[in-house]
Amino acid sequence: ALNREIDLSVAFRKFAITSMAPRLHKFPLFINTHPKETFSKPFFASLTALRRQTPEIQLVVEIHESAVTDLLRLRELSAFLRDIGVRFAYDDFGAGQARLNELGEAPAHFVKFDMGLLHDIHLASERKRQVISDLVKLVLNLGSVPLAEGIELEEEAQICRDMGFHLIQGHLTGRPIPADRL
């Protein structure tokens, strides 16, 4: 079952990248990885092949926090991605372990804050807002771009901007649509 999930992940990633290549222009394409494939040789090979096929695309690989269990392997992944011209993002930051050690040792280009932290942030206590704001400042000081996930309301977006988020993602900015309608 796991191999099937990984095979599907590879197939969907290839389809997404090749179908989006003509539509992206200067915009980056964020792609998810299956936590079990992130450090595998087949993943490295498939990503290398996709880079050769579509060198014009600005790819960003999202690394889920559950995939990060070994700092040495993470550094190797970071070096590999850099060598093939792919940036990476820590996905779902704050959903479980904060991964502060990894932020310092293997800095990502983007840090995607989990939607669970930011849902109804406009209604949250000042203390919660301060914690998130301090984390955003830390991410910025480490040279990464903070991205707020799951933003649905303008009030949430404004609080996120005030906290220093550079990017937002969620239904406020657009709902999922078929690629051919982009």
PLM region descriptions:
Residues A1:
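A short, well-structured catalytic beta-strand-centered motif of the EAL phosphodiesterase domain
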Residues E5-R75, G150:
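Catalytic core of bacterial c-di-GMP phosphodiesterases, primarily the EAL and HD-GYP domains
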Residues A16-S19, F43-L50, D70-L81, R99-E102, ...:
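A general structural detector for well-ordered alpha-helical segments in enzyme core domains, enriched
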Residues H34-E37, E62-T69, R87-L182:
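EAL-family c-di-GMP phosphodiesterase catalytic domain
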Residues R23-L24, T54-P55, L81, G85, ...:
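A structural signal for short coil/turn segments at secondary-structure junctions
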